[in-house]
Every structure is written in C-alpha cells, then in structure tokens.
A protein has these predicted regions:
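Beta-propeller blade termini
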Residues: 212-222, 279-287, 336
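Solvent-exposed N-terminal domain segments of exported/luminal and surface proteins
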Residues: 69-186
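Bacterial signal peptide processing site
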Residues: 23-26
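Structural motif
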Residues: 237-251, 303-311
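Bacterial N-terminal signal peptides that target proteins for export
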Residues: 2-12
Length: 350
C-alpha cells in the first residue's frame, strides 16, 4: 500500500511539472528546481574528471617574474620535488586547472619572495591573475603584481626567481663576480672547442660572435664560481630563425686544486635533427635547499620558448632536471647530450 502511495506521489509531481512547462515550480510554499543530469561521458565524471581537473601542487612552486612598465608578471614554472621540478597541469583542462590554481596559489594579495643571483631582493604582491589565451607549452596562469624592492624604480625586463613567502628559502649572497672574468672568457671557448671536436662538429668561424652568453654561478658555499656558457652557430638567443645551425650549452666548474676548470655538462643541439634549442641562463638559486645552486633556463625554439632546469646530482654530476612538455621540447630531446663528459683546462684561473 505504501508503495502505491509513493508511486502516486511521484506521478503527481511529474504531472505538475509537465503542466507548468518550466524548470522551477512553486508548489505549496516549496521551490522545486529540476536540474538535468550531466550527459554520460562528460568532463566531470569519474577518472576523466580527475584528469581534466589535474592535481594541484602540494609542495613549493617555483615562479618566474619579469618587470614591465606597470609592475611585473609572475608565471609558475613547476612544483619543487627533490632535485627536479614536477610539471603543472599536465593533461588537465587549461581553464579548469588555471582557475583552481589561481584560487589556491595566485589570489589577490598573495606575497612572493623575489630572488636575484641567489639573494632575497624584495617582494611581489599579486593584484590579479588570469589564464592566458595561449601559452609557452602549457596555458598556465599568469599573475600581475606590484614589486617592493630596495630600488625605487626598476627598469622593464629585470628577471627574478620567486617562491611564495611561506615556502621561500633564506637565500645567500654568493661571493662570485657579477660578470665573467677574463679567465672565464678565455677558458670557455677552449672547453667548447674540445667538446665540439669530440663530437665531430663544425667549429664557429668567430668564437667571440658564437659566445652568446657566459654566466658565473656559485658551485659551493665557499664561493667558488662555475661557468655556464652558450655558443651558437647560425643562430641567436631569441625565438625565431630556422632549423639550421646548432647550440652548445656547457657547465664548467673549478678543479679541486683550483688550477683550472672541468667540464661537467655538455648539451649540444643540432637543429636539423631535433629542431632549434638555444638555452640561456635566467638566474640561479638553491631552491631545493641541498646546498648547491640550480639554474633556471629559458630555451628558445623557432616559434616559442620554454623553461628547463639544470642542477647538480651527488655533488659531482650535473643533469637536466626539468623541461616543459611541448612539441618543441620533445623534439629537442633527440639532441646530443652528455653529462659525463670531463674535458679539462689546466692553468686557467677560476
């Protein structure tokens, strides 16, 4: 009998809804809203929903900051995980993931500690954030903010590494030269020539023109300076050009007896094999707090650029710890890399 009453009640409700011809019914002081269920296979069902949303980072996130005339932009690079970075939003819907990331990590008023050359130099306070219509390799959120530094006015184009204030390391002021010394400028081409000859590669016609960047960085707490250098043939450090020529990125560190340098990392990209890959060092910071500075790179392709990181492993080896996932970066994986090469220059003054 109760079953019949419940069935009858359902028929009355269904009949009332059919007669009203709308989705909202005011019936006996109770508002009833009829919401159709999502179609099967929609983006919000089960495991597919998890893939669409993507997991948000639970650890510290590394950010890239660049100043402009109105303040600065802040872009997430990756989640710090051990001696590498974990990609953000891989396989997730960009709009859904970006909205959740902004709500959790880039809310208005969020403060970030700015680092330059391994040292704390100021703060960025987020004013707004959005998901861009297009991106480098993934459409990650971009924030805008105001910068508070010891310098009253910063020119456009100044770059920083940043972490949320609550997760930022202390940083340290390294006692290394701001720019490459004369000894570094002499040693880098010698090591580059040896690396290229070992790989049967064409040598640059002019070494001064081929040296696109040379950047000192700290390799120990004692203040010893390593060298990160980029050499280019038929190319420049910018997005564009074609898939001709090659790049050579190298890391050299002082020998223990300080009588010269050892090459500990070589990354040669022959563009005809894997597409353009022209790396430059943005800055360095010991963001994983293991006692050695990691390098944040911007790598230029023919149509876009992306981020990579290089860092020490086990004290003596160096390896690429992170590369954004995009077509250009994947194609570049075919380039010749050798982190075990030990070319040595003796007698050079570190």
């Amino acid at each position: 009998m109760n079953l019949l009453r419940r069935s009858a009640g359902k028929l009355v409700v269904m009949g009332a809804l059919a007669l009203t011809g709308c989705d909202n019914v005011d019936w006996g002081g109770v508002d009833i809203a009829v919401v159709p269920p999502p179609p099967r296979g929609s983006a919000l069902e089960g495991e597919h929903a998890e893939r669409e949303l993507g997991p948000l980072p639970t650890g510290p996130v590394l950010y890239y900051v660049r100043t402009d005339s109105a303040g600065g932009t802040i872009v997430p690079v990756g989640e710090i995980g051990g001696d590498s970075l974990i990609p953000l939003g891989a396989g997730a819907d960009a709009e859904l993931y970006g909205a959740r990331f902004i709500s959790e990590h880039l809310r208005r008023g969020t403060e970030f500690t700015l680092f330059r050359r391994g040292t704390r130099v100021g703060t960025l306070v987020v004013q707004s954030a959005r998901v861009p219509a297009s991106g480098r390799c993934r459409r990650l959120p971009v924030g805008r903010g105001t910068l508070e530094t010891s310098v009253d006015t910063l020119p456009a184009g100044v770059e920083f590494i940043a972490l949320a204030k609550s997760t930022a390391p202390e940083g340290q002021r390294p006692s290394i030269p701001l720019t490459a010394t004369g000894g570094m400028m002499r040693v880098a081409p010698i090591l580059a020539e040896r690396a290229l000859r070992a790989r049967s590669s064409q040598l640059p016609g002019n070494w001064s023109s081929a040296m696109a960047q040379i950047q000192p960085f700290p390799v120990s707490s004692s203040g010893d300076a390593g060298i990160a250098s980029t050499f280019l043939v038929d190319d420049q450090l910018a997005v564009g050009n074609d898939d001709l020529g090659y790049s050579l990125f190298m890391i050299a560190v002082p020998r223990r007896d300080l009588t010269g340098y050892d090459t500990v990392y070589v990354d040669q990209s022959r563009y005809e094999n894997g597409g353009k890959r022209a790396p430059r060092v943005i800055d360095f910071l010991d963001w994983d707090r293991d006692g050695g500075a990691e390098l944040l790179l911007e790598v230029y392709g023919t149509s876009r650029s992306w981020y990579e990181t290089i860092g020490p492993v086990g004290g003596t080896r160096w390896r690429r710890g992170f590369a954004e996932s995009c077509d250009a970066a994947v194609a570049g994986a075919a380039a010749a890399r050798d982190s075990a090469t030990q070319d040595t220059v003796e007698g050079g003054t570190p």
